[in-house]
């Protein structure tokens, strides 16, 4: 089973990806992991990527695509895989499509965990983390017993810079601009599946399994 996982920041993609990977015995392939591995091992592609990153430039699509292609040809991908963070653009989606066609393979589905922007904003801006032990809380869904204090060690809990309203809104805007064309691309190929990401984690996974059972 070959799956592309889509969804906005804060949609719970990481949690669901882990569950899908375990249930279907396929590797969860994250673009971030691929980059880190290539860079730490000083592969030719890793060194090329680093040369752009060191200058504060975006890594060209071609480099990212080639890294992903290399990863998808490893032995653990023979029975399928779950791609998380790739493709991000229609150009990358077309490159993946071409790669699969050349191998007489095809994508089973592009799975979108759909969560409205207001819900994402509520979910992410409410997150708090302990300054000492790293314990995590949510002011609405998992509040501390004493306001502003960690249940585990009593230290202050704070909002991370990544979770401020301004930052979250910016991330949602970037996601919308990048991903909407991608959603339309997979829709046009009848490959898009969608689940409601506002439900409880277990229910979202159950819905995903039902969808994948129909592929």
Swiss-Prot record:
Catalyses which reaction(s): AMP + ATP = 2 ADP
Keyword presence, Cell membrane: no
Pathway assigned to this chain's UniProt record: Purine metabolism; AMP biosynthesis via salvage pathway; AMP from ADP: step 1/1
One GO BP annotation of this record: AMP salvage
Transmembrane segments: none
One of the record's GO cellular component terms: cytoplasm
List of residues binding AMP: 31, 36, 57-59, 85-88, 92, 160, 171
CDD domains: ADK (cd01428)
Keyword annotations of the record: ATP-binding, Cytoplasm, Kinase, Metal-binding, Nucleotide biosynthesis, Nucleotide-binding, Transferase, Zinc
Region annotation LID: where it falls in the sequence: 126-163
Subunit field text: Monomer.
Function: Catalyzes the reversible transfer of the terminal phosphate group between ATP and AMP. Plays an important role in cellular energy homeostasis and in adenine nucleotide metabolism.
Record's comment describing the protein's domains: Consists of three domains, a large central CORE domain and two small peripheral domains, NMPbind and LID, which undergo movements during catalysis. The LID domain closes over the site of phosphoryl transfer upon ATP binding. Assembling and dissambling the active center during each catalytic cycle provides an effective means to prevent ATP hydrolysis. Some bacteria have evolved a zinc-coordinating structure that stabilizes the LID domain.
Name of this protein: Adenylate kinase
Origin species: Clostridium botulinum (strain Alaska E43 / Type E3)
């Amino acid at each position: 089973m070959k799956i592309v996982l889509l969804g906005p920041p804060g949609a719970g993609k990481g949690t669901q990806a882990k569950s899908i990977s375990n249930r279907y015995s396929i590797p969860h392939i994250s673009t971030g992991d691929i980059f880190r591995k290539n860079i730490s091992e000083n592969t030719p592609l890793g060194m090329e990527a680093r040369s752009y990153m060191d200058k504060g430039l975006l890594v060209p699509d071609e480099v990212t695509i080639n890294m992903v292609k290399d990863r998808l040809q490893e032995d653990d991908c023979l029975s399928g895989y779950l791609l998380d963070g790739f493709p991000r653009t229609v150009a990358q989606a077309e490159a993946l499509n071409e790669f699969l066609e050349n191998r007489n393979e095809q994508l089973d589905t592009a799975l979108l965990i759909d969560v409205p922007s207001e819900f994402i904003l509520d979910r992410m801006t409410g997150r708090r983390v302990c300054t000492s032990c790293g314990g995590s809380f949510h002011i609405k869904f998992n509040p501390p017993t004493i306001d502003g204090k960690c249940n585990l060690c009593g230290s202050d809990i704070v909002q991370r810079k990544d979770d401020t309203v301004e930052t979250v809104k910016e991330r949602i805007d970037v996601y919308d601009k990048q991903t909407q064309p991608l959603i339309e691309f997979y829709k046009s190929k009848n490959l898009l599946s969608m689940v409601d990401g506002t439900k409880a984690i277990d229910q979202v996974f159950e819905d995903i399994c039902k969808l994948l059972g129909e592929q």
